[in-house]
Design a protein with these regions (language model features):
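Basic, flexible Lys/Arg- and Gly-enriched helix-loop patches that mediate nucleic-acid binding at interfaces
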Residues: 2-165, 175-262
């Protein structure tokens, strides 16, 4: 977003509050522009030149979009709103862009690991779209040792049957049409991480419903734990559960390059 904009819109854009709440904050005299209090929500500001300060929030530079990597703990829904606990509830209330953030993709409630949270709809769409075949890496713990022959099957791609009957109510009509037939998975990369051959690193380039669990389930294995450790060039690294960090410039540029946005 460039050029002159209203002050209340500016506050909404940086995630300080909703538009209605932003108006209340401004009228209450809690906002300064270039060191002076402003009471008019329609006051015009230049994001590239003016300094806007909001009482109770750290000074937040204006930017078009926000990009974070987030460690989703087990037990939370990958959604912005739900009856059950969601990832948004874990984020700091003064996180820049919070009101407009959404997850680019999902992780099951019982899974953990890396999510990308953003306000950039086009980037999120490309992360999730099968056309771009963005690699995602997981650490997977199985209930029993995997055989070399099964590793080879996964590396060549396997046919997945329809999801079990219990899963069907969870799917939208469109999603049901996408999984209610047999389709071969794209070749996966498998790396054995432990001598007992139960702990693996699995890299896939598609995001079908419960893909990892269904791949191993087809071969007779149960996934005991699932942790995503990378999405393309973005790594989970040393992030702690429920922690969010802005993507580095290098991470963002590399991600956009892979997704054809540069």
């Amino acid at each position: 977003m460039q050029g002159i904009i209203r002050l209340d819109k500016y506050l909404t854009h940086i995630g300080v509050n909703s538009r209605r709440e932003a108006v209340k904050i401004i009228k209450a005299g809690k906002v300064k522009v270039n060191g002076k209090k402003v009471f008019d929500p329609a006051f015009k500001v230049n994001p590239e030149e003016d300094v806007v300060e909001v009482e109770g929030f750290r000074r937040i530079p204006f930017q078009e979009h926000f990009y974070y990597k987030f460690y989703k703990p087990k037990g939370y829904i990958t959604s912005t709103k739900d009856k059950e606990p969601t990832i948004i509830e874990l984020l700091p209330k003064d996180l820049p862009g919070l009101k407009r953030l959404f997850p680019a993709g999902r992780l099951d409630k019982d899974a953990e690991g890396l999510l990308i949270l953003t306000t950039d709809g086009e980037l999120a769409h490309r992360i999730m779209h099968p056309k771009w075949k963005l690699e995602k890496r997981y650490e997977v713990l199985l209930d029993k040792p995997i055989t070399d022959s099964d590793i080879k099957k996964l590396e060549e791609g396997i046919e997945l049957s329809s999801p079990c009957h219990a899963e069907l109510p969870l799917l939208s009509p469109r999603a049901k049409r996408g999984v209610l037939h047999k389709e071969k998975t794209l070749p996966a990369r498998i790396k054995v991480l432990a001598e007992d051959k139960k702990f693996l690193e699995v890299a896939v380039r598609e995001g079908r419903y419960h893909l990892i669990k269904r791949m191993f389930g087809k071969l007779g294995y149960q996934v005991l734990s699932l942790k995503r450790i990378a999405i393309g060039p973005v790594r989970l690294g040393d992030l702690k559960p429920a922690e969010a960090l802005p993507l580095s410039q290098e991470e963002l540029e590399n991600l956009k390059t892979l997704l054809g946005l540069k």
